[in-house]
Each structure stands twice: as structure tokens, then as C-alpha cells.
Amino acid sequence: MLKGLTQLLRPNGYFTPMAWVLAALLFINRLSAMVKLFMALYLRQELGLAIETVGWLLSAYGAGLLVGSMLGGWLSDHVRTARLTAALFFVSVWVLMLLGLVTQVPWLAALLLLSGVIDGAIRTLHQRLIMEYCEVAQRSRAQALSRVARNLGMAAAGVAGGVLAQADFRWVFFASAAMTMLALLWFVRTTWRRPVLVVGDESADGSSVPPRDKPFLWLLAATAVLGIAFDTVYSTLGNYLRDYYHLSTEAIGWQFGLNALLVIALQIPLSHAVERWGSRWQMLVGSVLLACGLGMLPFGSGLAFVCLSTLIWTLGEALFMPPLNVLAMHFAQSGKSGQYFGLFFMSWSASALLSPVLSGQLYGQFGGHSVWLMSALLVLISIPLTWQATRGA
């Protein structure tokens, strides 16, 4: 098994060189995600803001993701993707620096909104880069490798962010800005002058207009509901573990790191093991595990129970995420890739807008346990939507 996995990870074997280049870019960029992981704690613990205010501020970031996802898709149909990506990385460096310096709520809201726009656009553009620089047969493999790279970066970000936050929360912002600058330099060095592959219009069902593509619309609905449930991990889990499980900031950081490390270790072998299930059953089983992992949090105590919860919902994440993104790429091959990717990531980004508000209000009014019961219910609601989206998949 280990020998087979080693063969898969050879630079010029199963994955193309460009898949490795884009995965490395995503890894470096994800190191700056420590800001997202610890933003809720920073706003509440360092700045002393109410939990409801924290929810509204994080929703500003979510609103930016929503706008940026669609804007990035639209712009990528008119501006060279590499040039647009580099410009967004450059602006992001300064936004992250400013987030660590300002303390007024209106300025924080504006900067979080702008940061969300940038992150949403970059997320969409990364998918476009895979389509532009990878052959059709290699795109799903590039997706898998990018997912491992993303979580490897998140693991490092969670651990490093926890250590930096213990010393001074502002170091989290400055380190994130430095990592974003490094991502920009890597991107310019490896991709700027690389020729784009000629991508032809490919359509699996003859439909090239997203609003008329019914399976794609079901996918958008399932994506939005799943996203709202899953985003509570980023918007609420840190404060919940501090308030109800009494974990330290560093222990919370290690919890995020555990999630990412599990994905790194299990994603590729797990994806191969369930490959014959098809997209539908991978997503359905993953959703059930996600609901169980999040829904069990109110019924236990102690670090070991939290780790068990993390293990279960991480397995669910590892099962439903890859087919979700591969399905989006399949629909995007209809020739309107910018529109499809924009709408898909806009749907996912809606969770970052709605989830902090919903979870913040539930947390403040009914206590932290209600957040995870709501999340589990939403995941279960997504199951029939997923069933409709994956007819024939």
C-alpha cells in the first residue's frame, strides 16, 4: 500500500508537474489562513467584542467571499487569469497587514469585506488555473493534490497561528501577510510566463447556461446548505471549545491542525478506496459522517471527545469535498467555465455570509450547543438535494 502511494506522489508520475506547481501555490497561500482560523478569537478575546458583533463582522468577510467568487469568475473571462491572480495576491498582503493594526469596528468590517472579495476571487481563479494549465484527464487528479496541499497548509497555519496568538494576536496577521507575499513570488516565478493550454468547449449534456442546468442548480442548493453547516467549524468552534470545553488557544489551534493532518494522511488513500462508489454515495456517506461528528459535540466533554468528534467530521469532509469540486468542474466544462465556477463558489461562499450570523445569534440566545444541533440538521437536509444533483453521476 505504501509503495503504491509513493508511486502516486512521484512528481512526474500520477500528477503532472503543473499540478504540483499549483498545489505548492495553494499550500503557501493556505499558510495565511491562520487569520481566518483565529479571527473570531481575536475579535472577542483581544478586542473584547460581543459574540453577536463577532458574528456580524465575520459575515462581512462572508459577503466579500460571495461577491468575490462571482466577480473572479466573470473577470477571468475577460482578463488573463495569471495577471489577475498576481494582482489579488499583492493587494491581499496590505489588507492582512491593516487587519492587524486597526481596531475600530467600521474599519474592521470594511477590511474583512475586502479580504473576503479577494479570497473569493482567488478561490475561483485557482479552479480556472487548473483548467487552463492541466489536461482534461489530469484535472481531477490536480484537484485531489490541491486539496491535500490546502490542508497541509491549514495544518501548519493552525499550529503556527496558535503559537503566535499565545504571544501576540497581531503576529498572526503579519505572518499571514508574509506568506501571501511568498505565494505571489512563487506564482510569478513558476506560472507568469507559462503558456495556457487551449481549452475547448466541452458539454456533457448540451447545456451551457447555468440557470437552465437543473442538476447544477440542485448542486448549488446542496452546496449552500452543506457550506452553512460546515462553516460553523471556522466561525464558532474556537469560541465554543474555549467556553464549553475550556481549552486553551494553543489546544484549539492543535484541533484545527488535527483536522488538516487527518485530511493530508487519509485523502488520497480514502479517495482511491471509495472510487467505485461514485460521486453520489461518496457525498451522501460523507454528509452523514459530518452530521454525526458535529452533532455529537453537545453530548460529551474533554479533549479526547473533541478529538473523536474531529476524526468523524473530518472523515465526512474527506468524503464529500472531492466529488463536490469534481462535479463543479464537470459542469464548468460546458464552455461557460467562469460563470459555472463563479456561481458554484458563490453558493459555497454564501455559507461564510450566513453561517456566522446564524451561529452567532444561536450562540448568544440559546447557547453554544444549539449551533451544532442546527449544523447536524442542515447537513441532513442537504442529503435529498445531493441526491437530485447527482442523478446519473
Predicted features along the sequence, with ranges:
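Juxtamembrane intracellular "pre-TM" segments in multi-pass secondary transporters
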Residues: 1-16, 192-221
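Interfacial helix-cap and linker-helix signal at transmembrane-aqueous boundaries
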Residues: 43-44, 75-76, 163-166, 241-242, ...
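Structural signature of the two symmetry-related core transmembrane helices
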Residues: 83-97, 281-295
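Cytoplasmic helix-loop-helix junction between adjacent transmembrane helices
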Residues: 113-150
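Symmetry-related core transmembrane helices of the 12-TM Major Facilitator Superfamily/SLC fold
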Residues: 172-188, 372-387
